[in-house]
Amino acid sequence: MSDVVSWNLQLSVQDGRLDDVHALIAEMVEATRQESGCLGYEWFLSADGSVCHISERYADSGATMVHLGNFGEKFAERFMSCFTPTGFHVYGNPSDDVRGVLDGLGASYLGPVGGFVR
């Protein structure tokens, strides 16, 4: 099986924070683009700006921990002031270290059973 760790994070946007959200997205995308172990990082907003989903994909648990460290150091406080998590689904077989971080964010885990990525 693959070592890839990915997730889909569903969020509600705090009232009055949409401008802050757009600025934060730009900063986080640029910072994450520099992480060599990040395979995919996409943000999506509803038309009214009230709902946000983030799709993230990392080469392995080590790359995931690099991202989580950067997130915690640079963005976590502002992120949590802009969003309320409403769902967090993690895919793959993350390490115990990764699970230790993601458990605190309310993650649910789904293990791989088949399929492929091109």
Where do the language-model regions lie?
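Short, surface-exposed ligand-recognition loops at beta-strand->loop->(often short) alpha-helix junctions
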Residues: 12-22
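Active-site-flanking beta-strand signature of metal-NTP-handling nucleotidyl enzymes
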Residues: 5-12
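Short, flexible turn/loop "capping" segments at secondary-structure junctions
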Residues: 1-5, 45-49, 80-82
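An amphipathic, aromatic/His-enriched active-site/gating alpha helix that lines ligand/cofactor pockets
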Residues: 33-39, 48, 57-113
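Hydrophobic alpha-helical membrane-association signature
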Residues: 24-25, 71
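Conserved beta3 strand of the protein kinase N-lobe
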Residues: 41-43
